[in-house]
Amino acid sequence: MSDVVLLVLAIILITIFTLIYYTIFFEFDETTFSKRLQVLTEYAKRTNADKPTPDVLGHVSDVYDHTYIVSWFKTDDLSTYHETVHDDTVEVFDFLEQRFAAAAAAVAHRVAPLAAEPDAFVVTGDAGDVKLRCPQHFRFDYDQLKCVPVDPCAGRAPGRYPMDERLLDTLVHNQPSDKDYSAGEHLHHPTLYLRCLADGSHAVRECPDNYTFDAASGECRVNELCEGRPDGFVLAYFPETLRVNEFVECRGGKHVVARCPDQQVFDRALMTCVQTHPCAFNGAGHTYITADIGDAQFFKCLNDREAQLITCINRVRGADGQYACSGDARCADLPDGTGRLMHTHTDDTFEYVSGQTICDNYNVISEIECDTGNVLENKLFVNKFTLGAQFPREVLDAGVCAPATLNNVRVLSDAFPVENLPNDYKVDMQTSVVGLATMMADLTTGADPDTAFGQNVLLAREVDAVGLSPLTAESIDCFGARLFDVMDARRANVCTESGGDLLRTIEFGDGAFLSVFRDDLTGSDADYKQFCAISYESPLKIVNSDHFERRILANILQADICAELYTTIYQKYTTLARKYTTASPKYNYTFVKRPPNIVVYAENTHLKNSTISVPTFDPFAPQPADNKIGPTNALFDPFADRVWRSEPGGDGDHWAPEAPPTQPEAPPAPEPSPLILDKKELFYSCYYELPTFKLTSCHAENDVIIDALQQLRAAVEVDPGCEPAKDLHFVLNAYAYMGNGVGCRSVFDGNNVTVIKEPVPTYTFNNLQTQSDDGVRYNKHVHVKDGRYMACPEHLYDGAAFACNAEPDKLYYLDNMQK
């Protein structure tokens, strides 16, 4: 018994020892031990001459961008002491001094990849950059910040490849290694193979039973079935490509495909050729192929006598031996239904890849469709322009969807159309301004949209052209029956109705301007001297100069509206004092100057407030009659008071009675001052270089005119229905549309200022607030607030109080220059 006990005890001790040994063996990390030994050796080499080896030694063991781990171990047995985590933007570890120090400067990236060397990377240390390299068969993965095995399908086209030793270690055993595989690189697994897919991914596949992978052809080939069998032996082996009249038999120790005699088919149940219809012994639903059909076709029995030809994207055979259709139509155009199908968008301006479909054996295994929504859609530039180009939000770049830029979008044309919103003047500016493809670079980098637009357009005026082709940016003379540029309204072209030939070019000099609604395109205004011309050279400033006003000081002309109105008012408000007849002014145009001044003098002119001197002696003054009843006064009364006068050279002293006091004559009524027509101010409203409205401010130099203006403004008459527009009277000829077919206008009929209701409105507007159809306020001198309408020069309008601070010595008149 003692021997048995000792044997059992020995077995127990051996078992315990074995367990302890394997526990220690498996827990021991040889790689970590080797690294720590190298660290200790390096530290000893560099410091032992100065200081002894410490009991605990630290080193940087892991780096994750700005975060790093310092591992501390005991130097006597290399066992772990502890680990600490640190941020290199805060502190850095000094290996030789074994202490931490404050970071001197921030480092953007501690680890960076090298695009030209996939297996290398750069580590930025405290002393500078250090280039490191991954082991062979590995590459650096920046996302994971570590070396990973090289992709097995990297650099390989889609297809089947033999499974060598390295691929087996990496893909099957999951033990990637950096060892040298060159000795067995010609060896491969007999049945396993690598399938590289079109999307760059891979799969490990295995050939069916009795098949071996042929590395040369990349196909699974059947193993030899005729070994030890006689010639003529028919095999129960029916490959997918075997036709209905074919079978496999042995010849010379190898299997070959044999064919039945004409008009016969092979009965796979009887294993012999028979003369009958293929459906006769298989029935409805049976499928078969013949030599006269395509690779993607097969016959399907409808009954025992008829079959239907089926055409597929891809023909496959199931486990039951029957043919069926498979595959996706999107893969039909790819060789063998395998590959990558790129989705490309092409238009007049840009070309880009919007996505991809990856197929394998006619089946879609991956599909990517990027968000190609137009980033320019519904975008307005300078509040009126839209771009006639589509630029995607994303495109496919390097197999992934990425933000679209000019680096991953191909530019087919440097120019693209620019369209403007509809406007009240029916002006089409697509031939005036053309977009440049460089605009997309600014728009995709977050630049101000209006600035990016203005800096990346080509204007017709820049190349001294009347118009540009919207697609090519080339100079053109015709675009329809007429062509003009509102950004350079010096001229206009008249063409044939088809727009094929130029008939004439109209040049607009002083006194003429572009009138878009006239058939001859020419408007006239004696005061206009191209005041709406834009002097800027920068396209950005030009496209932003859509609405502005020019203020001009000029002389009143002989036949302009100021002379006409002031003459009428002067005639009405000047009369002679006693006869109450209107003083007819007379013009003397010989005194008109250039620049013209008009001074009109009335008959019996007299300046207002002048002083009339009464003569001391009036020999023609009548003597008053004495009508008192009584004795007649004596011709000579010696007792009356007399004044004696002695005249030199006279005969002596004489006396003369005191003359009675003279009754003064009433002074005549003041006569009117002369009508002076001197200065006027012109306010031209401009839509780019197109003059739209002209406000004339006539300066009054006569008190009688100033008084008359006050009286006219105080006694304004208003037609029924125009009460909300009574304040139009501040500016003559001002018009406002109030909706419901009511249009009101301020007029002067020679006697009074009246706001009349037009029988038929001259203009109707969809937007009453802006008095326009497109919502743009072109007329800056008509104001609308709370259903009330007022005409007032813009610089005199008080919007808060809805009041017009009209100048008492000014008369205002408004012209619509385009309609």
From Swiss-Prot:
Disulfide bridge partners, by residue number: C207-C220, C260-C273
C2HC BV-type zinc finger locations on the chain: 147-196
Record: glycosylation sites: N210, N588, N609, N752
Cell location: Virion
Keyword Transferase assigned: no
Domain of life where this protein originates: Viruses
GO molecular function, one term: chitin binding
Keyword terms, alphabetized: Chitin-binding, Disulfide bond, Glycoprotein, Metal-binding, Repeat, Signal, Virion, Zinc, Zinc-finger
Alphabetized InterPro entries for the sequence: BaculoV_Vp91_N (IPR013682), Chitin-bd_dom (IPR002557), Chitin-bd_dom_sf (IPR036508)
Chief subcellular location: virion
Residue ranges with Pro residues bias: 658-671
Task performed by this protein: Probable capsid-associated protein.
Name of this chain's protein: Capsid-associated protein Vp91
